[in-house]
Each structure stands twice: as C-alpha cells, then as structure tokens.
C-alpha cells in the first residue's frame, strides 16, 4: 500500500479512540478556571496556598466523598471554593497518585460528576449552606489576605495525602501563561487539539504493543486537552485502562531541557515518530512553547476603586484614522519534492514570499526541502496578515528556477475552517516545456496558522519633512529644536495620521506653565489633545490624566495614565515585551511599557510599548491608540533632555509632570516571591519573541518545556517547543527603514530547529540550528519508569 495512504489510515484509526468526555467544552471551562486562579496568584505559593491545601484535605475531600456517596445532601450541583478547587486541580494532574490517595482514604476515586467549577456556576449558595452546616467555624471562601494568621497543620489530619501538593502547585502555576493567548479558545483550534490528543494517545498505545520505550512529549495544545481529560478522574481512568490496560501517568517533575537529556530526546523522538506514523507535522502554530513566564511588574494585586466607564473605541476614530490589521502566526515547512529530475536531486531549496506583502511580512525567504537535505529539519516561523497567498519557487543550487506554486490563505481562513494543512502542490514550470507533462514536479508543503487576531497598531513620530520615501524614520528625540515645528505621526504604511505640536497656551500667565498638545489633520482640522495646568496633563477633554507616580521601588511605575482605565507606565520592556535573545541588544532605557490594571488583570497586562529612541508607539488595544499616542508625544518631549534616563525625576518634574504621592490600592497580604512566576516553571516552555526584524516580519524563538510523564512501553512528557533563531535589529540598530526594508540577517527570518525543538536558540542573529528530525522513529530507552 502507498505510504501516504497508510499514514492516512493510521490517523483515521487514531480518531476512533473513544473518550467519554466532551473535551472541547471541558477545555473551554478549564481555560476559564486557570484564568481565575491567575487573578489570585497568592494561591501559587505562600500562606494562602498552605491554607488552601489544609482546607482541601480537611474539608473539601470529605465533603466531596459524602456527595459522591449520596448527592441528596446538597440540592443541586456541588461548587468547590476556588482555593480548594485549585489544589484539587493540581492533585488530579497526577492521576495515578490521585487514584491511589482516594482509594486509600475513601475507598473509591472521587470524581467531578455533579460538581460545577467555582468560575462556571452561579449556584454556589446551596453548597455554601451545606458547608456552613458541616464546618460552622470555617468560612466557605478563603480570606486570602488573612490566610497567614490561620493554622494549616496538614500533618495533624487523619486523612491527608503525603503527596507534596506545594510542589505540584508550583509545577502547574506557569501552565496558564502557555495557553492564555486568545486563539487557544478558538473552536477550530480546540477541535484540532482534541484530534491531536487522540493521535498522541494512539502513539503511546502502539509503543506499548510493540514494546517501544519512547518518552513522548506533547505540544501545548495536546497538553491542554490531556490536562482537561485528567480532571475527569473516573473517565480518564476508565478510558485509558480500556485503551492501554492501565492509567497513563502524567509526571511533570522533570524540567531539565538540556541537549541530550530526557526532555530533549523525548521531544525529538515524539516529533519523528508522529511524522513517520501520520505523515503530518507535529509542530503547530500557536501550540509551541512561549518561553518562561515574564517577570511580574508587581506581586500585589491591584484593586479597582469603583466602577469606571469603558472607553469607546470609536472615540479615536473621530480624531485619527489608522488601518485595522489582522495577524496570524505561521509555521511553514517544505516536506518533500517529487518528480524531481535526477540532475537536481539533493541540490534544491525553496524561496517563499507573499503575493501581497504586508507590514509584518514583506520579504523573500529561503527554506531547505526536508527530503532533499539529509534529514535536516528547517522550519519558518513568522507572522503576517491573512491576505493573499504564500508563493513558493523551487530553485536549484545554481539559482535556476524549476517552477512555482502558491497556497491561498482564504482557502482556510475565510472563514476559519482549518488551521493546518499538508498537501502536494503541483509546480508551474518557469519555462514552458512540454504542454502536458504527465509527471510535473510537486512540492509537499506543510503549513499551520493561528486564527486571525487584531494586530497591534504601530504609529511612528517623525520630524516633519516633505517625504519619507527611501529614507529611514528620523528619531523624534533628535537634538534639533525648531520653533513651531510639528511632529508627524504616520502608520506602518507611511500614511500620515496627524501632526502634533507642543505649544504654550494663549491664556497662560506670564510666569505660568500652561502648555498644550495640538493636533492638526491634513484637512486642516485642529484639536487640543492635551493641556498641562501646572500639576498634571489632562488629555482628550479631561477623559484621561497623565502624572508622575511616587514609587520608591526600583522597578516600579514611573507614570500613571488614568481615566476610563488604569494604565501605569514602566521603564523598559515588561511582561509580554520582555526582551528575548537578540532583542536584548537594545538598551532598556530606550523603552517604556504601558501596563493596564483591572479586575480582569490585577497583576497587569502589557497594552503598549513606547520606543523613546526611535519615536514609535505600539498599542495592543484599540482604546489605547489615541491616549497612547498623545502620552508618547508628551513623555518623549519631557524625557529627551535626559538621554532617555527615566530616573531623572527632578528634571522631568520641571518639564511638566508633578509627582503624586497617592499609591495604588492593594490587598493587605504578604508579598509573593518573584520566583513564583519566574523559576518554578516546570512546564518550562519558552519564548515567543515578538521583536520585529528587518523587513517587518517577526522571528520566533522557541525552546522546549519540561512537563513530563513516563509510561512503560510508551513514556510521555510535557509540552515541547522548537528551536529557532533570535530576533534582530533593523535600521539604525533596531529601527525600521521606512517600514519596508528587505530582510538581512537572523537567518533570513526563518527559524530552524531540530526535531527535538529543545531548549537551544539558534545562538544569535543569523545562526541556524540544524537537527536530524525526520528519521525513523527511534526506540529511546529511559532510565526510569514511574508506576
């Protein structure tokens, strides 16, 4: 039988695996729960976690045992307190140990049947009533702020697991960061994740039957579904016992991602076996490891002080117009070529580009063909707009074009029906030969993408001049001072958005300081966008205010932009903008990060980045575009005298921002250790570096995570990633030349990684990793097997 048909049959057989849970619906609830816990990070470590573990053992499990024995004790579903549910969540992610503990203390596995999550249910009042009746001295909801004063002697309990739940929680705490991007909740993405999870289990089943010892490592989409399945304890036990004869272990204790270690070889082996068995690529856009959880900007959650109106996104459109751009993440691999003339075998490569170049991807890149490169796996990872087509041109080593073909994005993304495809594309010969060639050259192309999402809006502040064409953006902060000069604001296409000017107010007192930011559109319309009254800046008809903060912390916020939302401005690149790899070449003093604090994001969400040196503002949210642009203009103007040093507060104050003594409202609780969000990462994934490189494309660098499990005859591990190149600098050491420069360096913007995809970035700008990725699936011996 043809190999491709065999691989299709294998995939179809894998999809027949019976799972007794609606994993797609359950995964959506799972994501909501992880988000709720992340808004209460005191549950990741410290006194609140210790108290939660005590309450879980002393109160929740006994209550659950009574309920599973007789649901009549509670009218309606049982709803666990958030803290108890979190510990329960982490306990169940060691399914073998959870099963053993439940059977030891309660004689049976305690399931979630009839239980509704604390974040999904609106019917917890009945559970609260039952809780108060059974535990009159213990509140249903844990007081996180005062948890430190409450006893938590777990060892004194009669029924208590010896499993180290503190470490279990710490290992799982970083997982949410890996699955928190918007596309993960997309139905098509989750449907494909469920299908890939079944294929993952199918590999394990086959390995057991053939006595192959392979430490299987899932990507993050698979791991999300795997976790979701384990949370349904009885279903997981029954489904896996039926499939492989035992409960599949999930061991997340191994976090060493070094070259040649178990995680590294495991991901390599899983990739090779997957692609050999199913004829599909294992690496998938949006499912790879994002890197270590960024360092938090605060360990104390922000508490909203009253309701605030939500900014209308249309407000900015009344003043400025800018293009709305969608973006997708793409992973591309050229798998094979057939009907290639013998004279060209082993000597070909592919040039790929977009038929409609855009602000994110506008260059031609080179990729090797896997089947023609002695097993060296080269994969391109990039972002682009979901428009036009990907164009491929097969080239010989003598730079001779052998033909071209293309793949349209609209085939899959308008609407989103499929997020990955692997197919043969017939080439159109560059030079017409025989009219009807019975065996045309064809390329096997594998591409995956994330669902389209809104791309950040990037505006550049440049000195006014006749034309920008053919020259680099001039930095806004140049030493030249021109009376009454305007600063042009242009978008990524170099289209003028508005002109800005700082000027003294006409009604200012002779010795007073009453300045204004004036905006002038091309049509001549004039707007007063901001006014300084001597104490702070008032923006956009007093809808926003900009002031300096008083924060003694070395890394605390420098400025506060408040209005319809609370935004704090920090020096350097923070959170999602945290520099990765080659992007570290830029000085952190060149940047400021805008971080929004809200009920949904009490620890802050990066919503914008100001590049002081090259005069640009990147806004991740539409509501930030206008106030962010005006604030950037003000801050750039005030800080330019200090050589971008944000520490010179006295000079800043003298230039128009008064220091405020008010502090953020915070919960009264012991500060969490920063290491909670940094070093305890045992799902350890790594790094989507969002730095733009020459040509506007984005280069992603990935490393392997380490959330591992072992299983006899089919060892399994945690989330994998892929190796890649780092981001690079553009014009003038990191800027972009007119928004349309050609690609140079950084491996041409394409990333390579071995089948392991493990832990090693491509060593710096321009370097590429090469690995043998697509050999026959190896039989990897493991030195330890857990029960």
Curated annotation (Swiss-Prot):
* Biological processes per GO annotation: auxin-activated signaling pathway; cellular response to osmotic stress; regulation of auxin mediated signaling pathway; regulation of photoperiodism, flowering
Q: Phenotype upon knockout?
A: Delayed growth and development. Late flowering and increased sensitivity to salt stress.
Query: Per its record, what triggers expression of this gene product?
Result: up-regulated upon auxin treatment.
Which body tissues produce this protein?
Expressed in leaves, inflorescences, buds, flowers and immature siliques.
Pfam families per record: C2_GRDP (PF25334), GRDP-like (PF07173), GRDP_C (PF25335)
Reported function: Involved in development and stress responses, probably through an auxin-dependent mechanism.
Name by which UniProt lists this protein: Glycine-rich domain-containing protein 2
Q: Which organism is it from?
A: Arabidopsis thaliana (Mouse-ear cress)
Name the lineage.
Answer: Eukaryota, Viridiplantae, Streptophyta, Embryophyta, Tracheophyta
GN (gene name): GRDP2
């Amino acid at each position: 039988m043809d190999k491709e048909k065999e691989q299709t049959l294998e995939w179809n057989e894998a999809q027949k695996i019976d799972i007794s849970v609606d994993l797609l619906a359950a995964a959506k609830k799972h994501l909501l729960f992880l988000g709720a816990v992340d808004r209460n990070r005191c549950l990741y470590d410290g006194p609140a976690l210790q108290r939660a573990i005590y309450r879980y053992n002393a109160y929740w499990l006994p209550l659950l045992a009574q309920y599973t024995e007789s649901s009549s004790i509670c009218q309606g579903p049982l709803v666990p307190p958030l803290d108890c549910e979190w510990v329960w969540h982490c306990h169940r992610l060691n399914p073998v140990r959870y099963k053993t503990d439940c059977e030891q203390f309660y004689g049976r596995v305690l399931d979630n049947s009839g239980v509704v999550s604390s974040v999904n249910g609106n019917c917890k009042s009945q559970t609260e009533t039952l809780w108060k009746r059974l535990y009159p001295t213990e509140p249903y909801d844990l007081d996180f702020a005062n948890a430190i004063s409450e006893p938590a002697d777990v060892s004194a309990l009669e029924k208590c697991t010896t499993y180290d739940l503190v470490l279990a929680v710490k290992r799982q705490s970083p997982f949410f960061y890996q699955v928190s991007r918007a596309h993960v909740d997309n139905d098509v993405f989750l449907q494909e994740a469920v299908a890939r999870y079944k294929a993952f289990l199918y590999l394990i089943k086959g390995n057991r039957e053939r006595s192959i010892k392979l430490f299987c490592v899932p990507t993050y989409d698979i791991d999300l579904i795997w976790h979701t399945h384990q949370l349904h304890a009885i279903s997981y036990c029954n489904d896996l016992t039926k499939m492989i004869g035992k409960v599949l272990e999930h061991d997340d204790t191994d976090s060493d991602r070094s070259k040649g270690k178990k995680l590294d070889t495991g991901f390599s082996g899983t990739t090779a076996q997957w692609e050999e068995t199913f004829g599909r690529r294992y690496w998938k856009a949006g499912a790879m490891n994002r890197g270590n959880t960024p360092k938090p900007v605060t360990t104390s959650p922000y508490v909203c002080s009253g309701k605030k109106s939500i900014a209308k996104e249309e407000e900015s459109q009344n003043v400025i117009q800018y293009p709305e751009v969608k973006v997708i993440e793409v992973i591309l691999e050229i798998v094979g070529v057939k009907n290639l003339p013998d004279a060209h075998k082993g000597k070909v490569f592919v040039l790929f580009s977009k038929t409609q170049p855009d602000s994110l991807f506008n260059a031609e890149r080179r990729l090797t063909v896997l089947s023609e490169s002695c097993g060296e796996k080269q994969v391109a990872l990039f972002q682009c707009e979901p428009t036009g087509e990907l164009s491929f041109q097969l080239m010989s080593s003598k730079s001779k074009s052998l033909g071209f073909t293309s793949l349209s994005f609209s085939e899959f993304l308008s609407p989103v029906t499929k997020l990955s495809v692997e197919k043969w594309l017939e080439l159109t010969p560059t030079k017409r030969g025989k009219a009807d060639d019975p065996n045309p050259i064809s390329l096997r192309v594998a591409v995956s993408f994330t669902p389209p999402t809104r791309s950040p809006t990037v505006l550049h502040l440049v000195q006014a001049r006749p034309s920008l064409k053919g020259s680099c953006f001039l930095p806004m902060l140049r030493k030249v001072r021109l009376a009454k000069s305007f600063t042009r604001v242009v978008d990524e296409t170099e289209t003028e958005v508005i002109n800005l000017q700082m000027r003294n107010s006409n009604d200012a007192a002779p010795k007073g300081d009453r300045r204004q930011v004036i905006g002038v559109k091309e049509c001549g319309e004039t707007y007063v966008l901001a006014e300084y009254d001597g104490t702070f800046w008032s923006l956009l008809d007093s809808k926003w205010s900009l002031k300096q903060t008083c924060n003694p912390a070395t890394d605390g916020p420098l400025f506060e932009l408040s209005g319809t939302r609370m935004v704090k401005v920090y020096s350097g690149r923070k959170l999602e903008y945290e520099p990765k790899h080659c992007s570290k070449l830029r000085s952190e003093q060149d940047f400021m990060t805008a971080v929004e604090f809200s009920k949904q994001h009490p620890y802050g969400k990066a919503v914008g980045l100001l590049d002081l040196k090259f005069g640009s503002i990147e806004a991740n949210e539409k509501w930030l575009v206008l106030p962010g642009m005006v604030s950037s203009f003000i801050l750039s103007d005030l800080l330019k005298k200090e050589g971008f040093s944000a520490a010179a507060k006295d000079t800043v104050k003298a230039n128009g921002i008064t220091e405020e003594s008010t502090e953020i409202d915070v919960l009264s609780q012991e500060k969490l250790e920063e290491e909670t969000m940094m070093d305890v990462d045992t799902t350890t994934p790594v790094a989507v570096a969002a730095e733009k490189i020459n040509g506007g494309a984005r280069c992603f660098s990935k490393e392997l995570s380490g959330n591992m499990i072992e299983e006899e005859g089919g060892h399994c591990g945690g989330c994998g990633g892929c190796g890649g190149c780092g981001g690079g600098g553009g014009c003038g050491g990191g800027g972009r030349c007119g928004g349309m420069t050609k690609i140079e360096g950084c491996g041409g913007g394409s990333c390579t990684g071995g089948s392991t995809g493990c832990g090693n970035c491509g060593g710096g700008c321009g370097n590429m990793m090469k690995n043998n990725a697509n050999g026959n699936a190896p039989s990897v011996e493991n030195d330890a097997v857990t029960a």
